[in-house]
């Protein structure tokens, strides 16, 4: 059992390291170009490795929080990648989109309940569960709403792709910080990347909205 855990932990670390590097390259590379596409694919499959190895380790050595966060993290990467295949309003959500959204919504709801229970017990880590759960449930619920009533915005796919891929990167970077950053309080290490990353995503969206607006002039 211990050997299996070590093997999957090694895969988990390798996948996480690859995701951090490939994700950074994809973010700075020109969008739609060869380097961005290759780095993006590498990032996506690295995230799949991180999620799969985390789920297996959770079964070998039960850790509920890690299990649900793994689902949330990969859901972000999965939906980000799927948006590149669903650019048109006529591209309806497939069975895998609905399945992933329902799983993510379930994970988000469980994290919220778990967070409330932990706070009730006086454990501040409950806030981490609540924040991750709220994002997970919010994203998945909004996705299902848009499956039924597709958005009218032409570049919706691009902004969703950007938001989800960077969101997954934030989750991976958070895991890196939790393991390596020891000089900050645990709660800050868990939540600061999300706070900073959310502002970063907002700034990036403003930049591209202005860029696309200028291109239409």
Which residues does each PLM region occupy?
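Alpha-helical membrane insertion/targeting regions
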Residues: 1-217
